[in-house]
Amino acid sequence: MKKIVFLFALVVTTSAIYAQDETLEVKGKVLYKDQVNSLKPPVPILNVPQSLSVITDEDIKLQGFRQIGDLIRYTPGVNTSQGEGHRDAVVFRGVRSTADFYQDGVRDDVQYYRSLYNVEQVEILKGGDALLFGRGGTGGLINRVSKTAQIGETFSSLDTGIDSFGGGDVAMDGNMIVNDNVAFRLNVHVDSLANHRDMFSGDRVGVNPTMKIQVDPATTIDLSYEYADHERFVDRGIPTDDATKSPIEAMKDIVFGTKDLNTTTLEANILKGSLNHNYSDTGKLNLSVTANDFRKMYQNLYVSDYTASMGAKMDGYRDVTMRESLIIALSNINEFDRGTLTVGFEMVDTENNNHRYNTYFSSTRDDNEIFMPVRNMNFNVANGNLTNRRTLETGGLTDADVTQDQVTYVDYISDLNNQSDTDIEVTSLYLQGNIDLADQWKMILGGRYDEVETTIKQYGITVDGTGKGALNGTNPSLTKKDSLFSPRLGLIFKPQENMSLYFSYSEAFQPRSGEQYKTFVDKAKTTVSSKYNPDVFENTELGFKYDMDSGLSLALAYFTGEQTKATAFDNGTGEETREIGLEIDGFEITLNGQVNDNNAIRFGLASVDATKSKGSGAAKEIPELTYSLWYTHQATDMFAISFGATYQDESYINAESGPLLPDYTRLDMAMTITPSENDVVRINIENLGDETYYPHSHSDHQVSVGESQNVRVSYSKRF
């Protein structure tokens, strides 16, 4: 049925366009807006045989976006996952990911909430495609294009804002001329985080100096260093009711954690350098080197089970990751009479050290305990929250040992659950041709060869009589080498210069060490078998794109995706949740740009059907229908008003017979006041109707409560 609807819409739209105008010309667009910078080489959106969304720095400010999840809410075909309250997590066309993030085309896969202060634009590519990015990206990816120093320009700006939750932020951006061939730019931000939930708070600091050096007319060097220091409360949400299969609204104000026990920190140092050299009129060489060092910790309590008679079964852990990566990428781009040829090489060397401690409750000598849900819960004293109505294992204790008034304490340093050291070495070679077959026909043809060698050393853990785990030597290091070839084909027909019809086929893969490289075998295993071969995804897409003379851009796409190689796997970390044999099909419609001089629109709609060919039940975290609308009316030169709406259909949290996230509609509003050319005041009212909604959940009893109504006032000054 979806195929029929899509093809009908495509035929009707195309016919109407031809009837309206047969000789339209492409209007010029602002810098970056009409190109996808994550692609090599950058190409106009019209000539990309793939669905994508581009959000510029101005879009981010207008809509008051503060993090990646805000952008996703207004992006069709993509929805957010909870990320356990400490990381960006996105579901790209049914595939959950915590690692498919890039900065200037370079992998950025550590788990954290990314800031937007130094972003020129964000590019969201949908559909698995390993050709240009390698492993991962099985459902899509997000690339942030950074602000860089600009030669020959001097400018500076200040952006600051506060909101009714009590949060605030300041960002500064300054570019200066060092001499005729050198420029320096500095971006800095400080955020104080707050929201509608008790105890939530946080701070983010980011500093990003960049330098551009024009060595000669044909050679440019860009240098960048970024420091990030983040800390925030971790909120895992509320439980669901087994009878109603829905979140318990009466608990929407209860936080199952405390500031001391639920927290995450991140410290990162990222150094990047790139060289661009035009060695001829038709040849260009790009070399980039990135070295980074991340220190990430998160610890949290969460509800692992709940019934009204029992109470809330609390569980938790503390997880520490230390990761260092060196990424070297080299590409050579040559233009010919009939197209462009890109040859690229990439080398990645990553060292990852991780350990995880379970929570340890003194009363149960285990990692779980039962408490009665109340506001301002306390997990370290006998405060009436501890209950003897237990149905779980009590670590050798009897019910008589556990009384209503018993004292308990919890710690994160007594019970070691796992520890591993991982080394990943990736060598990649790719080739892509953008070929003009005829005046109206273009083809993209290419492939990528990846060799991924993963060595993991799992440490032995022994549990003593008190239920505490400790190191007990090391298991033998296990090495898995995967060699894969990933093809890509795109065929584009352009009936006129500002219009394209396309077909594309691509593949992507995910090694079985997972996104975060912690393990690819069960703890008891000492060898690696073919069972742990990479998961492979196939993606096909049929689409239509049209840039109208008025400034509007229309895109229609019908897509299918299939997980062709997969085996059941659970690494026990709570981070890797895989759908086995996932099959999706759906369509997407977007309409963006200027309606006329005074009105602009950003509309997107996606419908996705998802099934599992292996196992039973519906695929989780995949709402069948999502749509968003952002409409801006420029009433006068000084005043503009915008209205936004987002809708997300109901979706299964885990399995078809389990709890559901209910559908919801959220309304937003913004007013922009421009008293002068260099001053802008914005007032954003988020969740205008104060809707109670639940955007995502990590598991059955960890449902996030959407933000209540919030008013944000921001001010931008250009100097």
Show which residues each predicted segment covers:
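Structural signature of Gram-negative outer-membrane beta-barrels, strongest in the C-terminal barrel
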Residues: 214-216, 338-340, 345-350, 365, ...
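Membrane-embedded beta-barrel scaffold of Gram-negative outer-membrane proteins
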Residues: 276-278, 284-290, 294-300, 494, ...
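Outer-membrane beta-barrel proteins
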Residues: 161-167, 189-216, 249-272, 313-329, ...
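Conserved C-terminal beta-signal and adjacent last beta-strands/turns
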Residues: 6-8, 19, 317, 321, ...
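Acidic/polar loop-and-plug regions of large Gram-negative outer-membrane beta-barrel proteins
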Residues: 191, 195, 210-278, 284, ...
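Outer-membrane beta-barrel translocator/receptor signature
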Residues: 118-120, 131-209, 215-221, 269, ...
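Acidic, small-polar-rich N-terminal luminal/periplasmic segments of exported/outer-membrane proteins
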Residues: 21-153, 542
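Gram-negative outer-membrane beta-barrel transporters
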Residues: 335, 439-443, 553-564, 569, ...
